[in-house]
């Protein structure tokens, strides 16, 4: 692992151009905050890379557990940051809008911690099985493990279709495994164990007990925090039964939005909806004097339905 050099951060400039090309108001808040935190730690590292990376030797044997928190937020150089954050940008836009901002923030925090723990377990196991203590000294840093976990979630929610990896079409459900192997052979300096740890954490969420454990912990926290005006109920397909309340206490339930989803999406996939929304935002900027609505601005349901149907009828 090399220490980054000072100079023009071309990767950082490209990342900023990507963000402004999409539009800050089109990026959900937790995704945007995750990008901002990673960029801030890149420009103002909490500790040098050698003191923030994770390894069995440093974390387990020397009890330096704070590295589990620091390692996902530090990157080797501006290109390492760029590729990770561009990937985070597109995964975050899709997943945060599906899961909701609070749950997505919970997922990011949990995955950031667990990928480090699983990485240490993998390195320790390999070192013991092969009798190679050098594996205990391998030090990893970066957000890519979390991204592989999010990749598993994205493929779980959108299992159909193919992606092109090194010129070969690969089904979405196997894409993370193909990328794991491809990155390892094309870029030998990357952490194979770190990426594998991310995949395993993602599978623990989609196929294992992790999501139920997170649901239970969230329920305990909410019960201790007391009643609130909003309740979120989650299942394996994301949020359902989102409930809000009027000022007089009457509940407003949005289950019908999910049952009549095609009315709002015109039958488009998530990727097509995202592309159309970005194009519409760009068109609105060029043809109106008013700026785009901030993220999270909510129209009344009937007004939203009227505007969307009017837009689709005009195309």
From Swiss-Prot:
Changing residue 144 to A: Enzyme inactivation. Reduces the cleavage of PTCRA and TRAC. Does not inhibit interaction with PTCRA. Stimulates interaction with ubiquitinated proteins. GO terms for cellular component: endoplasmic reticulum membrane; endoplasmic reticulum quality control compartment; mitochondrial membrane. The active site is at 144 (nucleophile), 195. It catalyses: Cleaves type-1 transmembrane domains using a catalytic dyad composed of serine and histidine that are contributed by different transmembrane domains. GO terms for biological process: apoptotic process; cellular response to unfolded protein; cellular response to UV; ERAD pathway; membrane protein intracellular domain proteolysis; membrane protein proteolysis; membrane protein proteolysis involved in retrograde protein transport, ER to cytosol; negative regulation of apoptotic process. It is an enzyme of class 3 (hydrolase). Residues 269-284 are annotated as: Ubiquitin-binding domain (UBD). Disulfide bonds: none annotated. It comes from the Eukaryota. Keywords: Apoptosis, Differentiation, Endoplasmic reticulum, Hydrolase, Membrane, Mitochondrion, Protease, Serine protease, Spermatogenesis, Transmembrane, Transmembrane helix. Residues 301-315 are annotated as: VCP/p97-interacting motif (VIM). It is a multi-pass membrane protein. It is found in: Endoplasmic reticulum membrane; Mitochondrion membrane. Inhibited by aprotinin. Changing residue 278 to A: Inhibits interaction with ubiquitin and ubiquitinated proteins. Reduces the cleavage of PTCRA. Residues 43-103, 155-180 are lumenal. InterPro entries: Peptidase_S54_rhomboid_dom (IPR022764), Rhomboid-like_sf (IPR035952). Interacts with BIK and STEAP3. Interacts (via C-terminal domain) with VCP/P97. Interacts with ubiquitin and ubiquitinated proteins. Belongs to the peptidase S54 family. Intramembrane-cleaving serine protease that cleaves single transmembrane or multi-pass membrane proteins in the hydrophobic plane of the membrane, luminal loops and juxtamembrane regions. Involved in regulated intramembrane proteolysis and the subsequent release of functional polypeptides from their membrane anchors. Functional component of endoplasmic reticulum-associated degradation (ERAD) for misfolded membrane proteins. Required for the degradation process of some specific misfolded endoplasmic reticulum (ER) luminal proteins. This is Rhomboid-related protein 4.
